[in-house]
Amino acid sequence: MGFRVLVLVVMATTSALPFTFSEEPGRSPFRPALRSEEAQALRHGLTLLLARRADGQPPDMRQPEMRRPEMRRPEVRQPEFAELSVGQRRWDVDQCMYYCLTGVVGYSYTECETMCT
């Protein structure tokens, strides 16, 4: 786990810190081209990442508006079985299974059977 964090930090710093070439004598030929706000934001993000890793939380650093929406299971509301005839109950379960299995979410047969019955 520690190695993955180290690799993540190295990748983040090397990809987020573009360098410009400087030919001035007496100076390093590479100098960071980041503005201070960008560098501060990067340091803050890495600090949060390391703190979350230390706490055992998942490293989701994206802003809330940039996060992918959570996939929710569709709520399958079943009418009371006492209200329906036997044929109507069978059709509702079959229809529920059909829509569950052919839906975008990709539930297994067992998951659909649990939700629909």
Curated annotation (Swiss-Prot):
Disulfide bonds join 96-116, 100-112. The keyword Plastid does not apply. Residues 53-79 are annotated as: Disordered. It comes from the Eukaryota. Coiled coil: none annotated. It is found in: Secreted. Expressed by the venom duct. Keywords: Cleavage on pair of basic residues, Disulfide bond, Ion channel impairing toxin, Neurotoxin, Potassium channel impairing toxin, Secreted, Signal, Toxin. One of its GO terms (molecular function) is potassium channel regulator activity. One of its GO terms (cellular component) is extracellular region. Belongs to the conotoxin R superfamily. This is Conotoxin vil14.3. It comes from Conus villepinii (Villepin's cone).
